[in-house]
Amino acid sequence: MVQSAPASEIAALILRGFDDYREQFREITDGARARFEQAQWQEAQRASAQRINLYEEKVAETVAGLRAGLADSELLDVERWPIIKSAYIAQIDLRLDDELAETWFNSIFCGLFSHDNISDGTMFVHTTRPSLRAHARAPYTRTYRPGGDLRQALEKIFDDYRFDVPYDDRERDLERIDALLHSNLPDWVCKDPDLAIELIGSVFYRNKGAYLVGRLFTPDEQWPLVFPLLHREDHGIQFDTVITDEAEVSIIFSFTRSYFMVDVPVPAELVAFLKRLLPGKHLAELYTSIGFYKQGKSEFYRALINHLATTDDRFVMAPGVRGMVMSVFTLPGFNTVFKIIKDRFNPSKSVDHATVIQKYQLVKNHDRVGRLADTQQFADFRFPVSKFEPECLAELLEVAPSTVVMEGDVVLIRHCWTERRMTPLNIYLENASEAQTREALNDYGLAIKQLAAANIFPGDMLLKNFGVTRHGRVVFYDYDEICYLTEVNFRYIPEPRFPEDEMSSEPWYSVGPNDVFPEEFPRFLFVDLNQRRLFAKLHGNLYDAKYWQGLQEQIREGKVIDVFPYRRQETPEQLLG
């Protein structure tokens, strides 16, 4: 029944929707431990996708409830929303997840109003919360003081983080982890009587792994510390290795990985702790990595508008070959690209706008195995014309006039995705040394194989559609032809019927819409003959249809790949199990 309500009541209804979302978010997250202990890997993948979709589902539910219960005259009167915002601030002030509650309020407002009404008076364009809580440590950590005896501290850690499944071989792992720590750290650190180990109390879960995350520190220095744990079915829990290198820990929290499942009592304080471990990571990345991708989006937007306000940076077209479906531009001083869908595609492309959007959503929900760049979707970005180089703006207006619109001295971008900027692989190889070329092409092949084992076929595997990250990893970022591997029909090219067949410009055999012939990959992927030969040595099995068919068979049997986001001390073949 439609009724009148004071601002405080509307604020309470919005907050009630947030509480419902947070409760279900925690419920999904809390199940991660049991899924890890019971080796329920497919259930873990489903839970990850369910949690990603939960936010939009609950926003839609809350907006529908507000519309059903309140008169449009008061709900949709934008002049009332500064008062509603003030009432909401009072209601979230004592919460431990107040910054997430602000972002929720923004989502509800945008579900009710067009983006023309966005202002800091009606919603939280700028946060009212402190950016980092000024606490010396996270609210729930465990601290161990080895006093020169690392082994004793490790034994206590093994005891404190026990699971309901026993360790596979506790003594073996203790000896190995102790040896690895002594190997990774200077000898004086291990013997320092003031050395301390601080670990976050909650375990981080993702895919088939669990992670203890924290730091080693002395009064003068600190090192990040991560213990990856595995559960080998029928073998129990094992400590796989120990990581103390900041670059390697950064990769574990990479934008190319799925989001962690971790109990987070105070999100801002956990993020502040992680920020101290990984100072090179932006707050947006850290919030996103622990599942709060909408908060990551808010932090990204605030960083973007601050960058534009405080620098002379101007948008330019991104370097690389122009896309057939997407147009890509960037800010030189801001490590992000902005991708918009063109109005008209190259005739060789069979996709439409709706299909492209579906492909990006597929990537959002799927296990990215460290080989797909995460994206954020934005609507109705508004930037001053003065922030665009004239050539960039002219090109965007030409290729996407329905998406990029001039409104006086403002450029309206109706829809775009943001993505981490990388060096296109084809450009990287132009200036690479022989060793760098070999390493990049090897990682390019590994990227294709790991995506395939995760049931992803990139479709267009040209070098220009892959990027190289600052850590040297090869990542796929062009999604308009991406599909599930099991949807593809991998075939061998039939033998020619007559000698003339091989000379014909047209195939002598029928080709279905999902048919792929791996034998054709070498000439399509590599113009450079040296690169073609090298790749054949490194990953020649990618040219064999039987390799792809074998992967499809294992995927259909429900097997889930092990893809480790770190270098393992032992290097067994990746297992499908």
UniProtKB/Swiss-Prot annotation:
Q: What is its EC number?
A: 2.7.11.5, 3.1.3.-
Active-site residue list: 374
InterPro entries the UniProt entry points to: AceK_kinase (IPR046855), AceK_regulatory (IPR046854), Isocitrate_DH_AceK (IPR010452)
Tell me the GO molecular function terms: [isocitrate dehydrogenase (NADP+)] kinase activity; AMP binding; ATP binding; phosphoprotein phosphatase activity; protein serine/threonine kinase activity
| Family matches, as Pfam families | AceK_kinase, AceK_regulatory
Q: According to its UniProt record, which reaction does this protein catalyse?
A: L-seryl-[isocitrate dehydrogenase] + ATP = O-phospho-L-seryl-[isocitrate dehydrogenase] + ADP + H(+)
Choose one Gene Ontology CC annotation of this protein and give it: cytoplasm
Leader sequence segment: none
Keywords from UniProt, A to Z, are: ATP-binding, Cytoplasm, Glyoxylate bypass, Hydrolase, Kinase, Nucleotide-binding, Protein phosphatase, Serine/threonine-protein kinase, Transferase, Tricarboxylic acid cycle
Compartment(s) where it occurs, according to its Swiss-Prot or TrEMBL record: Cytoplasm
Q: Which GO terms describe its biological process?
A: glucose metabolic process; glyoxylate cycle; tricarboxylic acid cycle
Q: Which residues bind ATP?
A: 318-324, 339
The keyword Cytoplasm is annotated on this UniProt entry: yes
Q: Which family does it belong to?
A: Belongs to the AceK family.
The record's listing under PANTHER family reads: ISOCITRATE DEHYDROGENASE KINASE_PHOSPHATASE (PTHR39559:SF1), PTHR39559
| Biological function | Bifunctional enzyme which can phosphorylate or dephosphorylate isocitrate dehydrogenase (IDH) on a specific serine residue. This is a regulatory mechanism which enables bacteria to bypass the Krebs cycle via the glyoxylate shunt in response to the source of carbon. When bacteria are grown on glucose, IDH is fully active and unphosphorylated, but when grown on acetate or ethanol, the activity of IDH declines drastically concomitant with its phosphorylation.
Q: What is this protein called?
A: Isocitrate dehydrogenase kinase/phosphatase
